[in-house]
Amino acid sequence: DHNHDGFRDLPKSDQINVANKWLYAADNGTQVRWGWKFVQENRLGGMLDYKNTRTMREAMEKDWDWRAGDKKMPLYGSHIRNRNANGYFKVGMPVGPAVYDPDEQDEMRSNLAFVADFDHFSEDAYFGLNDYRGNENTLSLNLMYNHYFTYRSSLIVGVQGHLDYYREKLLNPTPWIAANSVRNYDFDRNEREAGAYAEYTYAIKDKFSI
């Protein structure tokens, strides 16, 4: 509280991170990667003495009009809890013969790859009298083929799909407006995308590529 206004300049926060990754590499060049991670974060904001307790939350709701009722001003606060879970699976497989470049003394090989990724994010928060709850589930799928005509000439083609599943609600009580004491905002929606792509690359040594 550098400006001494009784409010935290930055939220008080704590975070937990857990992750696990695996890699399997076969003798033929095939690689399989998979893993997951989990993150949880809590952020407490508002006045310096505010704590995330039921008693203090109820005091904010009950005594919002503390001046008119000649009551003690309740402590204002906010709290955010974020949770994120992610899992992924990737497999890459070489296909066809390799193409060799005698100048580079190296070879390239065409390959087929598949990637699946799932992400879940949830937020449970309140800011004074306003409550927000949101969940997002995202699934991404990508199938890609990379073909080498020569060491410096290649074509990538692929298809991909993307699904977003949103569930969001904002509870916005305004007790000082009798006709609109409680208002709920619903932002639920689903978004889907699918597409295909192609990319050709030609490289002149390490100096230029198109």
Question: Model-found features: residue ranges?
Answer:
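Outer-membrane beta-barrel proteins, especially TonB-dependent receptors
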Residues: D1-I210
